[in-house]
Regions:
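Basic/aromatic-rich interaction segments and small domains that mediate binding to polyanionic partners
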Residues: 2-76
Length: 82
């Protein structure tokens, strides 16, 4: 069964390549995290997985309150391992 994606209007704001930087590390298995994201409704903490990272940021996969999947690059300081 496919997981619905979060519509762009409801998705978290994501950092761009110039902000998150390089090199990008992609683990064999994602790491469980809690992270702060910013959406049009404000800031909120989500649980999810870090699927990639750089020295400055992490790309997280998370589910919103409706069970829809989203991805966002966020600053490393906004992420904690669970």
């Amino acid at each position: 069964m496919a997981i619905d994606q979060i519509p762009l209007r409801d998705a978290a704001v994501s950092l761009g390549p110039e902000q998150h930087g390089y090199p990008v590390t992609t683990p064999d298995r994602p790491i469980e995290v809690a992270a702060w994201v910013h959406t049009r409704l404000g800031h909120r903490q989500v649980t999810g997985e870090a699927v990639a990272w750089t020295p400055r940021a992490a790309r997280i996969r998370y589910l919103d309150e409706h069970g829809r999947q989203g991805f966002a690059w966020v600053w490393a300081s906004a992420v904690q391992r669970r």
